Amino acid sequence: METTEEVVAPATTQQPATEVGSAKPTTSTYSKKQKKPKATTTTTTTDGTTPTHNEHASAKDPRKAQDDQVMGTNNSSIVSKRSVEKLYYPNEPHFFRFFVKKFQRRAPLINRGYHFRLHVIDVLVRNFLQEQRTGDAKGKRKVVVNLGCGSDVLPWQCLARYPDACRSGEKDGAKFVDVDFPDLIERKKRTVLETPELLGPLTNVVVPEFAPVPSTPAATTTAAATTTTTTELKTTAATASSTSTEAPQKPKKSPKPKDKSKAARAPAPTTAPTGIVFTSDQYVQIGCDLRDLATLQDSLTRAVGGDLSSCTFLFVAEVSITYMETPGADAVIQWASSLGDSEFVLLEQLLPSGPTHPFASTMLSHFHKLNTPIKSVDVYPTVASQVERFRSRGWGSGDVRVWTLWEAWADAEDTFVNAAERRRLDEVEPFDEWEEFALFASHYCVVRARTVARDGQNKKKERGIPNGRELGLPVEKVKVRWDDVPGQRGQRRFAAGAVLTSSSPSSEKKEEVKLLNVMGLGTKSRLQNCDVYGRKKVGDADEADGTDEEKTAVPFTFREGGPSTRMCHSLTDFGTAQLLVGGRASPSTPLKDCWLLEKTNGSESEWAWKRTNDLPIPLYRHSVTRLGKTDMALLAGGRGVADIFPDWLLYEPKLGWIRCEIAGDVKPTSVYGATLACLRQESDSFSGVFTGGLSDDGLIADQLLAWNLDVSNSSRPVVTFVPLQVKSGDDGREEALSRLLLTRFGASCLPQSRTDFLVFGGVIKDHLLDMEDEILLCSLKGDGELTITRRLVPEAANAKSPSHPGPLLLVGTSPVVTPDDGSLMIVGGGATCFSMGTFWNKGISTLELALPAAVENEASPIPAYGWVHEKTVDIIPGEPRSLPLRNQAPNGAEGNANGSVSVRIQPIPRVRLENAEDFARIVREGRPVVLEGLNLGDCVSQWGNGDYVAKKVGTDRKVVIHESTTPAMDFTTKNFRYVTTEFGDFMRRVEKGDRLYLRALSTDKPTEKPAVLSDDFPSLATDFVLPPELALVGDRLFSSVLRVSGPVNMWLHYDVMANVYCQIGGSKRMILFPPSDVEHLGFAPGASSSSIDVFSTLFGESSDSRYLAQVTHPHEAVMTPGDVLFLPPLWLHTATPTSDSSIAVNVFFRDLEGGCYAAGKDVYGNRDLAAYEKGRTDLTRIANSFQKLPAEAREFYLLRLADELRRKAKGAQ
C-alpha cells in the first residue's frame, strides 16, 4: 500500500517492548468463562529505558519523523483500494470498508491501476496457495508474510476466495502474517477485534496481555473444537520484561477514552508493543522494525509454532521495502532467501527510461514532496537490475521472473489476466486512459523469486526490449526551438491541431500562418475553445526564451456556431478547409457530428464552422487521413458506444461517408487509436500504411499493413491490404522488436513523401517507448518492405533558457506540419501520472524536418521561426442561426447562376449480409441500407400477380383503404378518404390505376392491436419469411404490415421504431432525410407527419425548393422485388411508386430498451418516445412560468431558452 495513492508503511525504528525469545510474554485467551485482568503495568525496553508514545518525539528523531510520514500515507492508499473493491468486486465480501470510514470513488485510471496491482499480487498468492507441492516441500505449512502490510486485507480476501487452498478452519492450514510499524499494527489489531466480519473467520484468537485491546465488545470467535465468545475486552499490559532493571510498578487502571475520535488523536499511554500482538490459527500480527531482522525472525518463528523448516514461505512486499535505505531492503531480500523453501513477491517502481522521463520525474518529485522518497529505484531502475538484485541475494539457484505491470497486462501465457477478463473490465466503468495506464504500468514491476525452481518454470523466455539503440538504428539529432507560453495557457491534451493561412491586410497580401489547437482536455475539464498561435521571425543569434508575445498583423475570429466540447477527435487538412470528425465527451458518450472549418466569404481573418455529413455511428480515437490532394478522406476504425468500429469509410464531400468494401484475403484487425497515412495517389486509387491500434482484448495489435483504395466507383470504394515486413536498420535483424516499435496506440503518422513517413509518439506493447525512439522516420518500398530509416532525437536549440521544460511527453499532443517549410510543431499534450500529478508539455516546440540525408550525430539547423500564443478563442456550439446564402449548399447542392439550386441526393448504399451479426451491426450504426440477396420466400415470385394475392387473402375480405383524388396524399390535410371495400375489388382498382393505398390493420382489434401479417393474413403469410440474417427483427418484433398501393405518394413522415421495408412486387422510389433535418421539413410540434410534398418541392424552382435543396440532406433508394430497406428510427421518409402498383411487407421492431418507449396503446408503432412526451409537458410548464412577465421579457427569455435547447440538441450527437 502506498501514498496519496502511493506510499507504504514498511517498518519502525522502535525497539521491542519485550525481548521476544529471552522472556516469553504472558498471554490471554478470551472466552465467556474468562475475563481479562484489568491491571496494567509499565514495560521497559531491552536497554532498560521506559518506552513512550509521544507524537512530538518525532521532531527530535528525523528517522522516526520520516517513518511517521510513510505510515500516515496508508490512509490514502486504502481509500483507492476500497474504491476498487466496491466497483470491481461487487459479489465478494468487502473488507477494506472496515478500514475506510467513507467511500470515495476514484478516477477510472486510479481504479484500473490499483485493480491490476491488487490482481497481480492476488494471482501470485493464489498460485502459491493452490500449488501442489512434492518432495521435501510436501506437507509443509504455507505461510504468507505481508511485509509492510498497512491496512491491506489480503488474509481475509484469500480466506474468502480460496477456502480450500487455505484449508480454512484447520490448524495446519495456510497462515497469514502481517508485519508493519508497531503503531500501525496496533490500530489494525483494534479494528480486527472490533469488527465481527474480520474476527469471525479466525479461530483460537489469542492477544498477548502486553498488547492493548479495545474496550468495546468483540465479535464471536470460533475455535477448532469449541465456540468461544469475547463479551468484553479491556486494555491490559503484561508484567515487565525479565530484562527490566526496575521493580514492577503497581498496576493502574487504564483510562477509557470519552470517544473514539479523541482517543485516536491522543498519545497512547504506553508504547505500541513490538513483536506478536495478535495470533490465531489463520492469522498473526507482528509489530516490528524490518531493519531488526533478528526480532522479525524470532517473532516469525514463534508465529509458526517454533519450527521454520516445517513451513514454506511467501513474502509479499507491495511497494513497501523501497522506502527503506537500500542496504536494509536488500538485507530483507537476502534474509528471506535463507529460510529454506521460500518465495518472494515484490512490487515496486522502475525508471525504465531514466529519471528525466516526464512520468518518472513527476513520480520522483511526488514522493520527495511527501518526504517519503522511494530509494530502491535509484539502484534498481530496470527489470534487468531487479533480476540481478535477487539472483545475487540467495535466489539464484531457483528462478527469478520479473514483469513490468504493462508486460503482465499482455503476458502471452495469460499468467495474470486473459483476453476475456480484460474485456470484462470495460464493463465495470468506461475507460479511455490507455496511454496513462501504459505509462504507469511501465514504471512498476512485479518480481516473483523462488529459492527452489519448479519443473519447467525455471526460466523466463527472454524476448528482448524494443530499443533503437540496441537495434543499431541510425540517429539524427534534430534541433528544436522551444517557445514558452506563460501560465497555464496552451495546456490541453487530446485536442486536434491545424495550420490555417490568412492574407495580411497589408498591400503585399502576405499570407500569415496561424496554428490552432482545437478543444481537448484542459487542466480541469474538456474545453469549448481553441488556442491560436502566430508565427514570428527568429534571428540567427536569437536565443529568446519565448516569453515575449508579439502582435501579429492578422486577427483571428470565429463566426458563431460550431462543434460542442470534445476530445479524441480528428482534424484533417484539406488545404482550404479543415474537416473535424467525431470525438467524445466521456468515454461512454462518443460523437458522430462532423464539421468543416472554412474561411468566410469576403473575410481574410474570419473563419466559420459548417456542419457536414455525420458519421454513420458516433466514434472517437478513429484514424483519418487525407487522400492525396483531394477533398476526400479515409477513416479507419474507432471506438463507438460499446464496440470497436470494424469498417473503413470514405468521406466524399457530396456523398458523405461511404462504407468501403474490404476485399482480398488479408483483413485488418478492428482497432482504435491506430496510425494511418496516405502516401501515394494514382488516377483512381490511393495507397498508404496502417499500423497498430488497440483491439477489443485491450492489447495493441501486431499489425503492419499496406492498403490500397480503389475509388473508380466512388459510391462503392474497395480497399485491399498487404502485410508488411520490417527491415531493421541496414541488416534486417530483430524484426519482432522493430515491429513493436512501429505498432503503437495513440501515435500519429505524418506523410513526408511518396515513400517516407514519420511515426510520432504514442505507446507500445509490453514496454515503455524509449525517448530516443518516439519519433521514427520510416520508408515503404513497393515490394512491401518497411524500413526504419532513422530515429529523430530532439535536441533543444535554446536549452540555455532557464525556463526550458526539458523532455516532452509525446502523449495527447497535436503534431502539425506546416505546408510551406515542412516544420513539425508539437503543441499541447501531457498525461495524468497515475495518482502522482499531471505532467503538461509547456509551450510549443518546432522541429525542422526539411533535412538533407542524415548523418549520425549531425544536427539539423535551428528552425527559423518561433511561435507566440495570441489568444484563446471560444467556439459557440450549435449551427449558425442564419440561413445559408444563395448558391451556398451545405449538403453538396450546386448553385446555378440564375439562383436556382440543383439538389444533390446521396444514394443509399446497397450491401449483402453474411450473417445475423452483420445486420445487428447495421442497426447499431443507425444508417439506412438496402439489403440485397435475401431469401424472403415464395412471395417475391408470386405476389406480382394481383389475382394470386386476392385469392390468397380472399376476394370478399373487407379492408379499409385510402382513396385519394391527387397523386400526393397528405395526412395533415386529409386529402383522401377512408373507404371500406372488398380486397378483390381493391386489387382490381389498383391494377386499373386508381389512386388507392392499403396500410393493413389488425383484423381482430384494429384500434387496439398492431398488425401482424401471420395473424391478419395467415394464408398469405406462408409465402413470406424473415431470413435468418434478420433474426434480430424477429426477436424484437412489434408488427408486420402488408402495404399495397397504386400510383399515389405516401406522405412524408417518420417512424419511432426501426423497421425493414421488404419490396415484394412492383417498385418504389424512397426519399429519406436524416433526423437532424426535421426542423426544415414542416413537422408541427407533436406531429409525426408533414404536409410537404417532397417530390414536387425538392426538385422545383420555388424559393421553398431552393431552401430545401440548401439545408436538407436527402438520401434515395429505388426498391425492386427482393430488396429490403433498413429504415432507422426517426429517419424522415416518403415514397412514390415507379411501377403501376406496389406490394410490400413492412416489419417494425424495437431497437431501443423497453423503458424508452411511451407507455400505453400504440397501434402503429409511431408514438413518440417517452422522453419527448414528458419534455413537451415540461415545456408547457416552463412557458407558463413566464406568464406573469411583460410580453417583451417573456419573449426574450423564452427565445434564449429555445436557443439553449437548440445548442444542446446540436451538441449532443
UniProtKB/Swiss-Prot annotation:
Catalytic activity: 7-[(3S)-3-amino-3-carboxypropyl]wyosine(37) in tRNA(Phe) + S-adenosyl-L-methionine = 7-[(3S)-(3-amino-3-methoxycarbonyl)propyl]wyosine(37) in tRNA(Phe) + S-adenosyl-L-homocysteine; 7-[(3S)-(3-amino-3-methoxycarbonyl)propyl]wyosine(37) in tRNA(Phe) + S-adenosyl-L-methionine + CO2 = wybutosine(37) in tRNA(Phe) + S-adenosyl-L-homocysteine + 2 H(+)
Keywords for the protein's UniProt record, in alphabetical order: Methyltransferase, S-adenosyl-L-methionine, Transferase, tRNA processing
Gene that encodes it: lcm-2
PANTHER family: TRNA WYBUTOSINE-SYNTHESIZING PROTEIN 4
Residue intervals of the JmjC domain: 1006-1166
Lineage of the organism: Eukaryota, Fungi, Dikarya, Ascomycota, Pezizomycotina
SUPFAM superfamilies on file: Clavaminate synthase-like, Galactose oxidase, central domain, S-adenosyl-L-methionine-dependent methyltransferases
InterPro entries, per the entry: Cupin_8, Gal_Oxase/kelch_b-propeller, JmjC_dom, Kelch-typ_b-propeller, Kelch_2, Ppm1/Ppm2/Tcmp, SAM-dependent_MTases_sf
Enzyme class: transferase
Protein name: tRNA wybutosine-synthesizing protein 4
GO biological process entries: tRNA methylation; wybutosine biosynthetic process
Molecular functions per Gene Ontology: tRNA methyltransferase activity
